[in-house]
Amino acid sequence: MKGFGLAFGLFSAVGFLLWTPLTGLKTLHLGSCVITANLQAIQKEFSEIRDSVQAEDTNIDIRILRTTESLKDIKSLDRCCFLRHLVRFYLDRVFKVYQTPDHHTLRKISSLANSFLIIKKDLSVCHSHMACHCGEEAMEKYNQILSHFIELELQAAVVKALGELGILLRWMEEML
């Protein structure tokens, strides 16, 4: 009976290891917090709406997230906190508020929001275990993002932030 249990356990472990890459789950290293996220699925959902959302953006001289380079400045220790704030920002101020008559786009945004909810849950666990440090620089950078968002009229800001989601996703990819 022990042999069966050992074989089953070994089979399960190998199955899990083989299955994980197929599902697109990636491990993100955020300082002392480590989470998994299906970045491949999030990228796919975003890529299906990116062009149409970016075409709505008429404020080409203003950036909310700036560039992936500016996000790279976030210290490793502060990444969990910074990402936690950005995930909440996208859930509360972007996905929830975005308006379009296009049902396909709304479905994709709903799917993106669901993926972000999973990330938020995992980041909350890190936060509750005190593994999500919030340094002054990370909070400054997040407040700059909020400031750029608030500069615009609400719907224009939402469109801008949604169109720039790729910047955040590329930054997350770099934490693998």
Swiss-Prot record:
Record key words, sorted: Cytokine, Disulfide bond, Secreted, Signal
InterPro entries: 4_helix_cytokine-like_core (IPR009079), IL-10/19/20/24/26 (IPR020443), IL-10_CS (IPR020423), IL-20 (IPR020442)
Keyword Disulfide bond set for record: yes
Superkingdom of the organism of origin: Eukaryota
Localization of this protein: Secreted
One protein family per Pfam: IL10
SS bond partners: 33-126, 80-132, 81-134
Presence of keyword Calcium: no
Gene Ontology MF: a single term: interleukin-20 receptor binding
GO biological process terms held by the UniProt record: hemopoiesis; osteoclast differentiation; positive regulation of osteoclast differentiation
Any GO CC annotation of this UniProt entry: extracellular space
Function text: Pro-inflammatory and angiogenic cytokine mainly secreted by monocytes and skin keratinocytes that plays crucial roles in immune responses, regulation of inflammatory responses, hemopoiesis, as well as epidermal cell and keratinocyte differentiation. Enhances tissue remodeling and wound-healing activities and restores the homeostasis of epithelial layers during infection and inflammatory responses to maintain tissue integrity. Affects multiple actin-mediated functions in activated neutrophils leading to inhibition of phagocytosis, granule exocytosis, and migration.
Family: Belongs to the IL-10 family.
Subunit-structure text: Forms a 1:1:1 heterotrimeric complex with its primary high-affinity heterodimeric receptor IL20RA/IL20RB.
Protein's name according to its UniProt entry: Interleukin-20
Name of the coding gene: Il20
